[in-house]
Regions:
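N-terminal "domain-start" segment that seeds a small globular fold
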Residues: 6-30, 115
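Short, internal strand/loop/helix patches
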Residues: 13-14, 86-135
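Amphipathic alpha-helical repeat scaffolds
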Residues: 21, 41-45
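Conserved helix-turn-beta segment immediately C-terminal to the redox Cys motif
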Residues: 35-36, 45, 49-73, 93-96
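Thiol-based oxidoreductase modules, predominantly thioredoxin-like and allied folds used
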Residues: 66-83, 98-110
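Thiol-/selenol-based redox modules, centered on thioredoxin-like
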Residues: 115-118, 123-171
Length: 171
């Protein structure tokens, strides 16, 4: 029993990480405690890129004290995000009016995978599931306590029932 408690106490949560904003500033995820967080890996030259519009709509509808979306640009799939952070920011703002937090471009798979994505995709780290990123716009659902509670495939629209019901507590 005591060994089990010490393992549980040492388990990392989403809040234990710090990301870097698209503008290069530290973004401690601990500031999101108490919110549901939808984490999405993004790309500007993908068939799923129009999901930015749905993500922004979801953010405008539900974002605030209880819910937030965080975008992580990446170039892991067929070079579909070749731009610099400033080019990505301009693209997202100009074409989709993105106001939800966007982070600096990272890697979501392979040897240079960002530690946040190592946690998101590895059951040994998140304690819930192995969930390798299969393509751009895969969605990870984080509860108010910083725990991974589910994923949504890349092709599934951000405003799907699974995500909306989770945000609104109808799940």
């Amino acid at each position: 029993m005591i060994a089990h408690l010490s393992i549980a106490q040492n388990k990392k949560t989403f809040y234990d990480f710090t990301a870097t904003t698209i503008d290069g500033k530290p973004y401690p995820l601990s500031q999101l405690k108490g919110k549901k967080v939808l984490v999405v890996n993004t790309a500007s030259k993908c068939g799923n890129t129009p999901q930015y519009a749905d993500l922004e709509d979801l953010y405008k509808t539900y974002g605030g004290d209880k819910f937030i979306i965080i975008g992580f640009p990446e170039n892991n799939f067929m070079n579909q995000e070749p731009g610099t952070n400033s080019e990505i920011k301009e693209f997202c703002t100009k074409n989709y009016g993105v106001t939800f937090p966007m982070m600096s471009k990272i890697s979501v798979k392979g040897k240079d995978m960002d530690p946040i994505y190592q946690w998101l995709t590895t059951k040994a780290e998140n304690g819930v599931m192995d969930a390798p990123v299969t393509w751009n716009f895969q969605k990870f659902m984080i509860d108010e306590n910083g725990n991974l509670v589910g994923t949504v495939p890349p092709k599934e629209k951000p405003k799907c029932d699974k995500i909306v019901n989770w945000i609104t507590g109808k799940q």
